[in-house]
């Protein structure tokens, strides 16, 4: 373009120079007619003026263009402007040379401007010669820029296609993730992908549970001729697709392609592509990281239509791969949600079962507590009353036989009270075990009382009774007196109930180590523990049934033999259970209990071996009945005249406890509730030194009464002593925390009551 402009300007300058020549000597012009010399000169003059005007306007336009644009080679344009201006001046001066003689000045200026025009035109021509190579280089660069523009257009087109693909994939992904149901996700994928890629058909194949077959579970256009399609998982195309991460183009005769086309072999179909989709489940994840497990794969098959000879493009393949990844993620999320819902349902069922179990346990616990309260009220309290009365009888003056009978009754009642406490206070967390109450006691007294009870039972049931007690038995031993007496009573009852009357019962007590060879064989078989320390002693209790050698002929004895006996031969389960419980008790006391059968399996004797810790003792005959007490009782002078308030809601127990306190010389005011106790303490005229409270009173229990007493009466006086039937250890600690000074555990015995009162008074006076 610039070269054409330069050539045009050069030709224009040459014509201007030619037109400025005024030498008309050789002109042979005709002066007649319209085209006369004068007319021609006028036309040339007008033309020169118009050319001058045009030459003067063109530089102005170029100057305006240069001032408002940034074009290269401005100095070339400046040369053109000078050349055009000089040409214009030449034409302007030449217009005055057509009439008459010319002045010297006009010819001089015309010559000067022509000379300048010649110089400028030559300079411009030379400049164009140097500029043409640069212009040619510009042309090459223009071609290069055109090539770059074409490449940029291709890249822009690719970016537009990628953007379009991303938009389509995003729309498809949004449609897929609208649902969290696996079947809806797959159905939506097939429909939307078919719209985007203009597919003839699409299908999804799922593996079965055993991973031996691929089942056609979802299809865009199902073939009505076949309702179910199965392909073996070891099919070559299936294996190839499952082992490849990218899209696989299937063969025309592929079973997977034919079965997924929806044509059934009757119609043509286009190229078929297949890609695998991992089917991850929630169990494959731990902390968000998949385990290295054999992941099952589904296969998505996409079929193009046969028209227009379409093939799979890179864009379509990329869309299929991206969609397959998105479907795998969506299905894994749906699987996790489904499994979480199932887990939530299972947890809900378990929670409801736990709530029902908790309610049942609370109801059972409530029923157990209610039963314990009823049993405590119906069994404990009467037994506590009996024990309290017997303790009063023990302090009275009696004959030796009466004292033995009262002591036997006291011991039996104590054992029965312990059994009742075991039944009522036993806790499931204790596994049915009862704690031992180990203390020092008189073994002679225990044997004497057991023999008294055994003789009474034997005579009542028509048996004779004999007693064989070793004289060198120690008196003071350490062990559980109640449990020992309980086991001995069980042996007597068991032997008497398992045989008929008319025989003799022998109650034998010996020191271990002096028995027969049969006893030694028992020890050798490990029936009791023999590896104890030297300061322990083994005592063997035995109850044996023997035939009467010379039966008495008096009527009383004969009458006793016909007394009906209670027998339990048909209740072997209860007998075994009782024997097992007694064996556990004996083993807890480092001993054992067993039965020695005679001929034909008939029970004839029962042995019990127990271990006791020995202490220095006074060895006296048991039958003499004058064994000393463990300790001499302290004087009750400190208790005489002591003002005591007794609060117990049970009338019988309150009366017995009041009688025990009065026997100790105390002045007792008995009330039946906590409110009456507080009213009695508010009486200024009566200054009570001791308050005895039953902890299980209704309306206001003993703890609440004690708290109110300490709040209004002070922290030191009156002394507060609790009465409770509970055997739990934490009760005493709670009593001390509530400001009480002592605790007496029911049954209330006379010597226990006196000892606790003396201890509390002595502690308070210190």
From Swiss-Prot:
Residue sites binding Cu cation per the record: 87, 91
PTM description: Autophosphorylated predominantly on Ser residues.
TM stretches of this protein: 5-25, 49-69, 75-95, 115-135
Cellular compartments per GO CC: endoplasmic reticulum; endoplasmic reticulum membrane
GO biological process: negative regulation of ethylene-activated signaling pathway
Membrane topology category: Multi-pass membrane protein
Modification sites for Phosphohistidine: 377
Domain GAF, residue spans: 181-331
In-chain residues carrying the UniProt-annotated modification 4-aspartylphosphate: 694
Major localization listed first in the record, in broad terms: endoplasmic reticulum
Protein's UniProt keywords contain Transmembrane: yes
Cross-referenced InterPro entries: CheY-like_superfamily, ETR, GAF, GAF-like_dom_sf, HATPase_C_sf, HisK_dim/P_dom, HisK_dim/P_sf, Sig_transdc_resp-reg_receiver
Cited SMART domains: GAF, HisKA, REC
Cofactor(s) required, per the database record: Cu cation
MF terms in GO: ATP binding; ethylene binding; ethylene receptor activity; metal ion binding; phosphorelay sensor kinase activity; protein serine/threonine kinase activity
Purpose: Ethylene receptor related to bacterial two-component regulators. Acts as a redundant negative regulator of ethylene signaling.
Family membership: Belongs to the ethylene receptor family.
Protein name: Protein EIN4
Gene that this sequence comes from: EIN4
């Amino acid at each position: 373009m610039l070269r054409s402009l330069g050539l045009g300007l050069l030709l224009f300058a040459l014509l201007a120079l030619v037109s400025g020549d005024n030498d008309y000597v050789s002109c042979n012009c005709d002066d007649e007619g319209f085209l006369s010399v004068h007319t021609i000169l006028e036309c040339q003059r007008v033309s020169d003026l118009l050319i001058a005007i045009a030459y003067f306007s063109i530089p102005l336009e170029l100057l305006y263009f240069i001032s408002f644009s940034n074009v290269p080679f401005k100095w070339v344009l400046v040369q053109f402007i000078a050349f055009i201006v000089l040409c214009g001046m030449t034409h302007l001066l030449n217009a005055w040379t057509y009439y008459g003689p010319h002045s010297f000045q006009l010819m001089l200026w015309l010559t000067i401007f022509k000379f300048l025009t010649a110089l400028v035109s030559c300079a411009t021509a030379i400049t164009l010669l140097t500029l043409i190579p640069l212009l040619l280089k510009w042309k090459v660069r223009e071609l290069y820029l055109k090539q770059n523009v074409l490449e940029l257009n291709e890249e822009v087109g690719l970016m537009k296609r990628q953007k379009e693909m991303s938009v389509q994939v995003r729309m498809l992904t949004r449609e897929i993730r609208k649902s969290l149901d696996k079947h809806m996700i797959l159905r939506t994928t097939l429909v939307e992908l078919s719209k985007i890629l203009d597919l003839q058909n699409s299908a999804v194949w799922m593996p079965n549970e055993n991973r031996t077959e691929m089942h056609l579970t979802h299809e865009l256009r199902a073939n009505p001729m076949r309702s179910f399609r199965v392909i073996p998982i070891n099919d070559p195309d299936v294996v190839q697709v499952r082992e490849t991460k990218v899209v696989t183009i299937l063969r025309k005769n592929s079973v997977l392609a034919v079965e997924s086309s929806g044509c059934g072999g009757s119609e043509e179909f286009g190229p078929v592509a297949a890609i695998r989709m991992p089917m991850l489940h929630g169990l494959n994840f731990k902390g968000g990281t998949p385990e290295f497990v054999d992941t099952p794969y589904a296969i998505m098959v996409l079929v193009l239509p046969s028209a227009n000879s379409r093939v799979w493009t890179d864009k379509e393949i990329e869309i299929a791969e991206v969609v397959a990844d998105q479907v795998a993620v969506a299905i894994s999320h749906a699987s996790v949600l489904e499994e979480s819902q199932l887990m939530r349902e299972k947890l809900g069922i378990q929670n409801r079962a736990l709530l029902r179990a908790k309610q049942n346990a609370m109801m059972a616990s409530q029923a157990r507590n209610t039963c314990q309260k009823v049993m405590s009220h119906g069994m404990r309290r009467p037994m506590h009353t009996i024990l309290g009365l017997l303790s009063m009888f023990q302090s009275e003056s009696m004959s030796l036989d009466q004292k033995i009978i009262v002591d036997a009754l006291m011991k039996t009642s104590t054992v029965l009270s312990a059994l009742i406490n075991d039944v009522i206070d036993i806790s499931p967390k204790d596994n049915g075990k009862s704690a031992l109450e180990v203390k020092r006691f008189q073994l002679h007294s225990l044997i004497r009382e057991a023999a008294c009870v055994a003789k009474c039972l034997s005579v009542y049931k028509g048996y004779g009774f004999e007693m064989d007690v070793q004289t060198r038995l120690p008196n003071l031993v350490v062990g559980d007196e109640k449990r020992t007496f309980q086991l001995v009573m069980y042996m007597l009852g068991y032997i008497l109930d398992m045989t008929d009357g008319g025989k003799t019962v022998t109650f034998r007590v010996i020191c271990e180590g002096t028995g027969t060879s049969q006893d030694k064989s028992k020890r050798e078989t490990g029936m009791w523990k023999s590896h104890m320390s030297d300061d322990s002693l083994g005592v063997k209790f035995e109850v044996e049934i023997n035939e009467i050698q010379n039966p008495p002929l008096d009527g009383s004895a004969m009458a006793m033999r016909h007394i009906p006996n209670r027998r339990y031969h048909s209740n072997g389960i209860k007998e075994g259970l009782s024997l097992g419980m007694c064996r556990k008790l004996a083993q807890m006391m480092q001993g054992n209990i067993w039965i020695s059968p005679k001929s034909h399996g008939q029970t004839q004797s029962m042995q019990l071996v127990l271990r006791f810790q020995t202490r220095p003792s006074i060895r006296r005959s048991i039958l003499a009945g004058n064994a000393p007490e463990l300790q001499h009782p302290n004087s009750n002078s400190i208790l005489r005249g002591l003002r005591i308030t007794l609060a117990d809601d049970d009338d019988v127990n309150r009366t017995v406890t009041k009688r025990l306190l009065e026997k100790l010389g105390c002045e007792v005011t008995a009330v039946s509730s906590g409110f009456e106790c507080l009213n009695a303490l508010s009486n200024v005229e009566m200054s009570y030194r001791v308050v005895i409270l039953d902890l299980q009173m209704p309306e206001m229990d003993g703890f609440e009464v004690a708290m109110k007493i300490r709040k209004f009466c002070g922290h030191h006086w009156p002394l507060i002593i609790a009465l409770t039937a509970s055997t739990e250890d934490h009760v005493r600690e709670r009593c001390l925390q509530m400001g009480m000074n002592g605790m007496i555990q029911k049954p209330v015995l006379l010597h226990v009551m006196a000892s606790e009162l003396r201890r509390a008074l002595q502690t308070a006076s210190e």
